[in-house]
Curated annotation (Swiss-Prot):
It comes from Brucella abortus biovar 1 (strain 9-941). This is Flagellar M-ring protein. Residues 274-308 have a biased composition (Basic and acidic residues). Its main location: membrane. Residues 273-340 are annotated as: Disordered. GO terms for biological process: bacterial-type flagellum-dependent cell motility. Belongs to the FliF family. Gene3D superfamilies: 3.30.300.30. It is a multi-pass membrane protein. The basal body constitutes a major portion of the flagellar organelle and consists of five rings (E,L,P,S, and M) mounted on a central rod. The M ring is integral to the inner membrane of the cell and may be connected to the flagellar rod via the S ring. The S (supramembrane ring) lies just distal to the M ring. The L and P rings lie in the outer membrane and the periplasmic space, respectively. It is found in: Cell inner membrane; Bacterial flagellum basal body. The keyword Cell inner membrane applies.
Amino acid sequence: MAVVWMQQNFQQLIEQLKGTLGKLGARKLIALGLVGAALMGAILYTSIYLGRPSYETLYVGLSRDDVNRMGLALGEAGIPFDVKSDGSSILVPIGKAENARMYLAEKGLPTSNNAGYELFDNMGSLGLTSFMQEITRVRALEGEIARTIQAIRGVKAARVHIVLAEKGSFRRGDQKPSASVVIRAEGGFSAESAQSIRQLVAAAVPSLDASSVTVLDTNGHLLASAGEGANGAALMTASLEQQVASHVDDSIRKALAPYLGLGHFQTSVQAALDTDRRQTKETTYDPESRVERSVRVVRESGDSRNNRNDNATGVEQNIPQEQIQNRNGESSTEKMDRREELTNYEVNSKTVSTVSDGYSIKRLSIAVVIDQARLLQTAGTTPPPANFVDQQITKIRDLVATAAGLNTNRGDVINVTAVNFLDPAGADMEPVSAPWTDTLLRQSGSYANALAILAAVGLLIWFGLRPLLRDQNVKPAGTEVAIREAGEVATPNFIGGAESVGEGVQAVIGGPAAYADQMKTSLSDLRQRMRMPAKLRLEQMIEMDEERVAAVLKQWIHETASGREADPAKASAMPELKAA
């Protein structure tokens, strides 16, 4: 019986659905079909879009030719891939990157314009001249250096040209090698990187000086050249001054932050440096540490006499005689005595040679601006004491001078001023969050998919389920009038009580839902009614009040004759009533 009742209810539901669809009309049926097709399309698109595999990066920074070749190779291998909007990155599904790289490596992809020492792999030694070997060696060296330069941050592509010295037997002067580097730079490349490239190329090429390397970018801007010796020193000095000023500024901020708080002061530091190279040689002697090394003593004495004869010259002097008589003359005696002493000492000496190749601070200029409102808050009283701000400024000036290491002898200048800040304290120090528009744009794809699904479901409910539910809930006016006219008709109570015929008729006409509500009175009543067929229940109702049942049947016949479509429940109940 339960199976038969379920079959009858299912057939009744099918009949009701057919009747409801028939009442909708052609326009509503077409609209309902379009909404259903749109919903199915949205569901299918969403399932395909969300069900596709996630991708991971295979290669980045590729040229357009490499992307085309790699795309063809991956397509032949049956490996799905995708290309980013920038056109320089290839993506493959997660888990297939290793296989894709191995397959592309087998095909020799991605290729590089900067070929290195692999050039010798494809060259045969037969018929190869020394000139060709030298050219190939230079090309390989250029390619290897270019690959290394491309690994530097901010360098997207590089090209290296090297001119080596030619060896000649009759050449008087030695020719020095030179090199030039052309790079395609992107964000993050600085002037220091250009100097690093010069040092790299100079170290990779024998006998190449860094000053002989020229670096420029693809826009034609000269980044480093041989004639920038003075400019290079000036750039280095400016960089050192900036570093020193930044260090002093950090020291001042660390000293003032606990006292005033971040955002309540601003500092500015300018540093002037002396980067001249100095060489100093100093020799110091210690006279107290002398040691006697040698002593030399010279003594000299002499005795001399001088007699002078006063004899006249004549004939007598020419005659030989035994003895010549001397006449009295002048005589003198001289005696000399001299002593000389020389002592040599060893004295300790110290020679200091100093070479200064660094820098020294010539002058510091420091400016500090303090929020006056913050100073007044630290007073603790309202109004603050007299000259409170001036006293605080004096303390802060001394604190800043100590933190910065100021030296008045070299002309350092410091200025501390208290003013009212325009912006709220610390407003510029708060972290800036990303605007909500950026978040919305990043999630726009997910939002669009969700809105499409919700819109499709809403259209289906509005144009499809809503008319069905509305037609099911609307009862014919004639039925309600007939029931009101019929009144309450007593029906036999199988449990021992009684109920109205109107409730029984409403349960039969209202369909399975109304019939189930009536059967909830008790468990025993439900079981008995489940076993009883509809024909038996109608017969019992007719036996109890034939007049009211006849009135209901007349109303149904009147509705059928007027051209309105009868309810399927009424149509199924009329043959049974006639038979009864």
